[in-house]
From Swiss-Prot:
CDD domains: CYTH-like_mRNA_RTPase. It comes from Schizosaccharomyces pombe (strain 972 / ATCC 24843) (Fission yeast). The lineage of its organism: Eukaryota, Fungi, Dikarya, Ascomycota, Taphrinomycotina. Its main location: nucleus. This is mRNA-capping enzyme subunit beta. Belongs to the fungal TPase family. The keyword Hydrolase applies. The gene is pct1.
Length: 303
């Protein structure tokens, strides 16, 4: 017997076993990859049409804006939302409706309501601090930054020649008395949103701010209003916190605290509304959703 040959064959056994193990490992790896592929999570579609569905609230507000931007266009339009309280004219208390979430009121119901856009000084201060923190956070890398401005101005209101309800407003810079604007502001339409889960309701207003000539030098203002305003701008949506002091005898106090959110680029909004009229609604819906999301963040923050 050739021992050398036997020893040679015996020494080959480990390498043969190693090859078998390696081959088994490769097969096992193939099976695992197949199994991973077979149990992959399927893609989730938005719905059975795989199309985005616009919330009713966004659609109603978009239609409301489109009417005054395109159908019956207001030339010098201002569109803003204010936080406040819907008051029942019969009870003089906040309205109570049998609904559980944010609800748009039919404009025909507006005659039964009054909207008070005032809030307490502590609520105003809290929202100021909240927005200041949001401003700081937006300056971090990867964010779209806020713009910020603090202004103080005086508004002088003058009666018109026809003594109409719409007055001429002259706005001046408090520091140097420079005239910033002279307009006749006319309220065109309101849309009220009742928000039972939060401290504030919402009023969306359409106004016409028509530039006019300065009142004559001997005409005295019927009302003077001082404005201390902190303004923030993010993605062309303006957020203003304003403290006003006025001599209007209608209110019990001369000091009021308000928060408003306003579309900063009306030309762009009008273009989006025209596209919506022509059948391409998505750009307008996205802008309205952005606007309302900003309003909702502020409305819910102190509730």
């Amino acid at each position: 017997m050739d021992l050398k040959g036997l020893l040679h064959e015996e020494n080959e056994l480990p390498s043969i076993e190693k090859r078998k193990i390696d081959e088994n490992a490769v097969e096992h790896d193939k099976v695992e990859r197949k199994r991973t592929k077979s149990v992959a999570v399927p893609k989730i579609e938005m719905n059975f049409l795989n199309k985005p569905i616009v919330p009713d609230t966004t659609k109603v507000i978009s239609n409301f804006l489109t009417h005054y931007l395109i159908t019956e266009p207001v030339e010098h339009v201002e569109i803003e939302a204010k936080l406040g309280t819907l008051i029942d004219l019969e009870t003089q208390n906040r309205f109570e409706f049998p609904v559980m979430n944010e609800t748009i009121l039919n404009p025909e119901f507006n005659l039964r309501t009054r909207f008070e856009s005032d809030m307490t000084a502590s609520e105003h201060k809290y929202l100021n601090e909240f927005l200041n923190q949001a401003f700081r956070d937006s300056q971090k890398p990867g964010r779209l930054p806020f713009a910020y401005k603090h202004t103080k101005q005086v508004d002088l209101f003058y009666e018109t020649e026809d003594n109409s309800r719409d007055k001429i407003r002259v706005s001046k810079n408090q520091s140097d008395n420079q005239v910033l604007a002279c307009v006749k502001k006319r309220r065109v339409a309101d849309l009220f949103l009742y928000c039972p889960n939060d401290a504030f309701d919402i009023r969306i207003s359409i106004s016409d701010e028509l530039p006019v000539s300065m009142p004559s030098g001997n005409q005295q203002p019927s009302l003077t209003r001082l404005k201390d305003r902190v303004g923030y701008v993010h993605q062309e949506i303006k957020i203003d916190l304003t403290k006003t002091t006025q001599n209007d005898p209608v209110y019990d106090t001369t000091e009021r605290h308000e928060l408003e959110v306003e579309f900063g680029n009306i030309a762009d909004l009008r273009d989006r509304a025209q596209k919506a009229k022509d059948g391409m609604e998505a750009p307008l819906f996205r802008r309205v959703q952005l606007f309302m999301d900003n309003v909702r963040i502020l409305r819910r923050e102190h509730s």
